[in-house]
Amino acid sequence: MTTETFVKDIKPGLKNLNLIFIVLETGRVTKTKDGHEVRTCKVADKTGSINISVWDDVGNLIQPGDIIRLTKGYASVFKGCLTLYTGRGGDLQKIGEFCMVYSEVPNFSEPNPEYNTQQASNKSVQNDSSPTAPQATTGPPAASPASESQNGNGLSTQPGPVGGPHPSHAPSHPPSTRITRSQPNHTPSGPPGPSSSPVSNGKETRRSSKR
């Protein structure tokens, strides 16, 4: 035996709902992108009224005044309004007409701000939880460059000073190399020494000739 649920006991997220209600109104047909026809109907029992969404041929068969048994339905919030749906394996069966005690009020499909706040809070929780991870990951890299800059300013010459001190010493090395290159240039100036010897020899020969 399946237990029947009253309209007043329907809450968002409930599944496997079994109800008996009478159809009060049938709404306009709207078509989805897939070509399905969707119709929203207003139904009621003795505890209140609610909207139910019916698809395709079933929606065309439902008429106001029909007494219908819903099996394996579920409830969800659509645009801030509590709505009934036929779930997978669910069924709508006509069991009578007109003769049923019902109450049109309260209407449980009226827009409820609580449903909107719940949906907004759920979205905000999801949005807040997702960005926290990237923020945590971006924090450590920001600290590491600061530590590197401190090491560059410190006495340790391995990371930072490679670019700093060496360029200052670089200009000192080239002049030293130039000095070493100038030495071989001075060495060829040495040979004039031996060239002076033939001059002295010439003087001696002249002296000897005078003698």
Curated annotation (Swiss-Prot):
Subcellular location, principal: nucleus
Processing after translation: Phosphorylated by ATM in response to DNA damage. Phosphorylation prevents degradation by the proteasome, hence stabilization of the protein and accumulation within cells.
GO cellular component: chromosome, telomeric region; nucleus; site of double-strand break; SOSS complex
Keywords: DNA damage, DNA repair, DNA-binding, Nucleus, Phosphoprotein, Ubl conjugation
SUPFAM superfamilies, A to Z: Nucleic acid-binding proteins (SSF50249)
Gene Ontology molecular function: DNA binding; DNA polymerase binding; G-rich strand telomeric DNA binding; single-stranded DNA binding
Amino acid composition bias (Polar residues), ranges on this chain: 114-128, 177-187
Record has Metal-binding as a keyword: no
Residue positions, PTM Phosphothreonine: T117
DNA-binding region coordinates: 22-92
Location(s) in or outside the cell: Nucleus
Amino acid composition bias (Low complexity), ranges on this chain: 129-149
InterPro entries: NA-bd_OB-fold (IPR012340), SOSS-B (IPR051231), Ssb-like_OB (IPR048970)
Pfam families associated with the record: Ssb-like_OB (PF21473)
Gene3D superfamilies assigned: Nucleic acid-binding proteins (2.40.50.140)
Matches recorded under CDD domains: SoSSB_OBF
Gene Ontology biological-process entries: DNA damage response; DNA repair; double-strand break repair via homologous recombination; establishment of protein localization to telomere; mitotic G2/M transition checkpoint; positive regulation of telomere capping; response to ionizing radiation
Similarity remark: Belongs to the SOSS-B family. SOSS-B1 subfamily.
Biological role stated in the UniProt entry: Component of the SOSS complex, a multiprotein complex that functions downstream of the MRN complex to promote DNA repair and G2/M checkpoint. In the SOSS complex, acts as a sensor of single-stranded DNA that binds to single-stranded DNA, in particular to polypyrimidines. The SOSS complex associates with DNA lesions and influences diverse endpoints in the cellular DNA damage response including cell-cycle checkpoint activation, recombinational repair and maintenance of genomic stability.
Protein name in the entry: SOSS complex subunit B1
